[in-house]
């Protein structure tokens, strides 16, 4: 769209990459070395710092900044004017200043056809794992350990893998939940 700026990668052999079927609305900026998946919607005035990864089908509200090295998971939804200074897990709804994990993005999952009867067990497991990670007394690392004690279907497995990477050394960590955990 109009007035979008995209910076190229900073070093030889690196890249700034934008996938297919994305919508970057007016006055968005992508910093160097950003990697965008497919089917992403970025509303007006989003400022993305360098080395940011945004997975497929994320929806990002307008007038916000995304800190460098942050990752935004697939099918996540970030509310407008949210301060995004930590990783946003897939399938989650984040909003606020500072940004906080609010809930699963159930509307986004439904819009992607992931609420069909044949996927009911997978959505139920995703909800249970999310509740274990964000609504129990466990810290994220302990919740991940407990979640991995059972066989995980693809959605819950992706959520856990994303969070395991997010809490690894040298990363910014996941967005905290409402209540500050």
Predicted regions: what they are:
Residues 1-100:
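Structural signal for interior beta-strand "rungs" in well-ordered beta-sheet cores
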Residues 91, 97-181:
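Terminal amphipathic alpha-helical/low-complexity segments used for targeting or macromolecular assembly
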